[in-house]
Amino acid sequence: MRLEKRRVILFVAITFLLSWGLAAYPWFGGMTQDSLNQPAALLLGGYMWMPALASLLTRLLTCQGFSGLGLRPHIRGKGKYYWWGWSLPVGFSLAGVAVYFALFPGRFALNLQFPQLEGSTLLAMLLAGGMVLVVPVNVFTGVIGEELGWRGYLFPQLCKLTTPGWAAVISGIIWGVWHTPLICMGWDYGLDYPGYPWAGVAVLTLCCVAMSAWTGWLTCRAGCIWPATLFHSGINVLYSIFLLEGNFCGQAYCPLLGAHPLTLIGGWLLLVSGGWILLKSAHLFAGR
């Protein structure tokens, strides 16, 4: 038990040291997401890979070995978890869009102009096309680096120390706080919102806990990290589509209360369902 705790602490320390070390130059240099120079952009390009590197270094330094990385896919009898990992982000996003624009119908606007398509049709095409075309690419451009660390190492290590539900909560909090330098530089929510940047860190951390519930469950049930990687990648891709289109809003809005799935309104179904998984974790993670 003592060794397992040391491994968790060492992994978290290495992850934050490496990641925040890469972010230090642009972060303390006063740069933002929109004003990065080339060296800063190159440094931040490695940020998402640091959890994977930390997991490998922790295994090496504690003589843990490299089995159980979670990379071997298990398809037979587990295919539904891959489908869930792929499709759930779309469901969460559509539910968020529906509720957000039901609450604020006057805000809906599309900046892209396709006269032959209605706005709702174009939105559906953007969401579906992003999932089909971009998710497979996004998996290998940073998401796999995160998942090798968070679900491939931290989550199963925490499961040795506590229940899967609490492991999901703890790893989700760590995952959310890990994004702090990026949030301070304007990722996800920009720079102009009440409580910047700590309100942004808090909202993203809450969303990360909900995502951690889903990705932890997918990892437990599938026996590998790939369904969780698809889920994580899907959320990233859909969030990016929303930011490119200004949350599909033609009026000013609070970024923490936007339409994309990493906000308090757009992410309502992610948050509610993630909370439900945590409440039922004793049964769900065991497959009952």
Regions found by a protein language model. Name each.
Residues 16-24, 90-98, 173-182, 233-245:
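Aromatic-anchored segments of alpha-helical transmembrane domains
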Residues 144-177, 216, 220-224:
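Membrane-interface helix/loop boundary segments of multi-pass membrane proteins
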Residues 21-66, 79-90, 107, 111-134, ...:
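Alpha-helical transmembrane segments in multi-pass membrane proteins
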Residues 60, 194-200, 231-288:
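C-terminal membrane module of polytopic membrane proteins
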Residues 183-196:
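Membrane-interface interhelical connector segments
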Residues 1-13:
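N-terminal membrane topogenic signal
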Residues 24-33, 186-189, 245-250:
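Juxtamembrane "helix-exit" motif on the non-cytosolic side of transmembrane helices
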Residues 13-16, 49, 86, 90, ...:
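Residue-level signature of the transmembrane alpha-helical core
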